[in-house]
Design a protein with these regions (language model features):
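Carbohydrate-recognition beta-sandwich/jelly-roll modules
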Residues: 1-217, 224-233, 237-238
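Aromatic-lined carbohydrate-binding/catalytic grooves of carbohydrate-active enzymes
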Residues: 187-275, 280-283, 287-337
Length: 338
C-alpha cells in the first residue's frame, strides 16, 4: 500500500531478498519447496539442463488469461526453507500477509550465477495485451488501475538444525502456535469424513436428440440411509459432505437462486436428511456448493456472464476451460465456465 511508482512504468513484480541465505558452489545443503508435502532440492546437484523451480502459491490466478497450459503449478502452503550443512545453519521463510500474490522460485548454481537460492516473487500489477479495434491488428499493453490494498509480510524462523525432519517440526510448531485449533487431537476424537455425490450431468436421448440432464447418484433418501447405517455400525463422530444436491448437480448453475434437484427427491426428503443430522450427536452434515464458479449460465437464474462474471485486465470475460493433457489446449469436448 505504501509503494510508489511512476504510472508510465507500473511495478509488475516484487522480489524480496532474492539471495538471502544463498550458498555458493563449495557448500553443501538443500532447499525445501512447497511441492506436494515438501520437496527437496540439493545444492549444486548438476541438473543445469532443467528449468528452475517455480510454483504459484495456492495455484494460478484465474483473473489472468492463458491460451495453453503445460504444467499446472500449485503450492498448498507458502513456505520455503534453506538448510546449509556446511555452516550448520538454516531458516524457514513463510509468506504471511499477501501470500496469495506470491510465487515460490528456487534454483541451483551453474545456470545464471554461482548461487543456490530460494525466494518469493509477488505479482503486484497484472497486465495484458488488448486489441485496439477489430479493424486492425494493433494491440496495446494495459494494466490494472493500481496496487492491491494489501500488506506483504514474510516471517523468518532461524535454526541451527539442518535435518529435514527438524525443519518440518519447526514449521509444525509455527502452525500450532499461530492456529491453536491445530493442536493434538486424540484418536477418540477423530471424525470419519464422508462425501456423498448427489447428481451429475448425463446425456440422454429424447426423440433421437442428445439432451444433457441430471442423473441421480445419491438421492436425499439414500444419503440419509448411508448416515443411519454408519451410526448403527457404531461410528459416533461423522463429518459428512453432500455435493451436487441443488441446481442440477455438481456442475451447477448460479447459486444466486437455490433449487433442489427433482431426480434426487423432494424438498421434504432433503429436510428429513438435515433434520436427522441435526438431532444425531456427533454428526455434522455440510451441504456443499460452488459459489466462486458458474458452470451453466441459464436464463433468469440470477447470473449474467456479461454483467456478473469477473473480467480480465483486457476487459474480456474470464472464461475458464478444461485443458487437454495431450495438446495443452482448451478441450472443446467440455463447455467453458465462469
Amino acid at each position: 500500500k505504501e509503494i510508489s511508482y511512476n504510472e508510465d512504468y507500473p511495478i509488475v513484480k516484487l522480489q524480496v531478498l532474492p539471495y538471502m541465505g544463498a550458498s555458493n558452489v563449495d557448500e553443501k545443503g538443500y532447499m525445501i519447496v512447497p511441492e506436494g508435502t515438501g520437496g527437496k532440492i540439493n545444492f549444486n546437484n548438476g541438473k543445469t539442463g532443467q528449468q528452475r523451480y517455480q510454483s504459484d502459491v495456492y495455484g494460478w490466478d484465474y483473473g489472468q488469461a492463458r491460451t495453453t497450459i503445460v504444467d499446472e503449478t500449485k503450492s498448498n502452503f507458502p513456505l520455503l526453507a534453506i538448510a546449509n550443512e556446511t555452516t550448520q545453519s538454516s531458516f524457514l521463510c513463510v509468506a504471511e500477509e499477501g501470500s496469495s500474490y506470491a510465487t515460490v522460485q528456487a534454483d541451483i548454481s551453474g545456470k545464471n550465477n554461482g548461487y543456490n537460492y530460494g525466494t518469493f516473487i509477488y505479482s503486484l500489477i497484472h497486465g495484458e495485451n488488448m486489441d485496439v479495434s477489430t479493424k486492425s491488428d494493433t494491440t496495446v499493453r494495459v494494466y490494472e488501475d493500481g496496487l492491491p490494498n494489501e500488506t506483504l509480510s514474510q516471517r523468518y524462523i532461524f535454526s541451527d538444525k539442518t535435518d529435514y525432519s527438524d525443519l518440518a517440526k519447526e514449521y509444525r510448531g509455527y502452525l500450532q502456535k499461530k492456529y491453536p485449533s491445530l493442536g493434538k487431537v486424540g484418536s477418540d476424537k477423530q471424525a470419519l469424513a464422508v462425501e456423498m455425490i448427489g447428481a451429475v450431468d448425463d446425456t440422454e436421448h429424447i426423440l433421437g436428440y442428445p439432451v444433457v440432464r441430471s442423473q441421480s447418484l445419491t438421492s436425499y433418501t439414500q444419503a440419509k440411509s448411508i448416515l443411519e447405517d454408519l451410526q448403527k455400525a457404531g461410528i459416533g463422530n461423522i463429518n459428512a459432505k453432500y455435493t451436487g444436491w441443488f441446481n442440477t448437480g455438481v456442475k451447477q448453475t448460479s447459486a444466486a437462486k437455490v433449487k433442489t434437484v427433482g431426480r434426487l427427491g423432494s424438498s421434504s426428503d432433503l429436510e428429513d436428511l438435515t433434520a436427522y443430522a441435526d438431532k444425531t450427536n456427533g454428526m455434522q452434515l455440510y451441504l456443499n456448493g460452488t459459489f466462486n464458479y458458474v458452470y451453466k449460465d441459464k436464463w433468469f437464474d440470477g447470473f449474467s456472464s456479461t454483467r456478473n462474471a469477473a473480467k480480465f485486465v483486457s476487459r474480456e470475460e474470464c472464461e475458464l476451460y478444461n485443458w487437454d493433457p495431450i495438446t495443452y489446449q482448451a478441450n472443446d469436448d467440455y463447455t467453458d465456465y465462469h
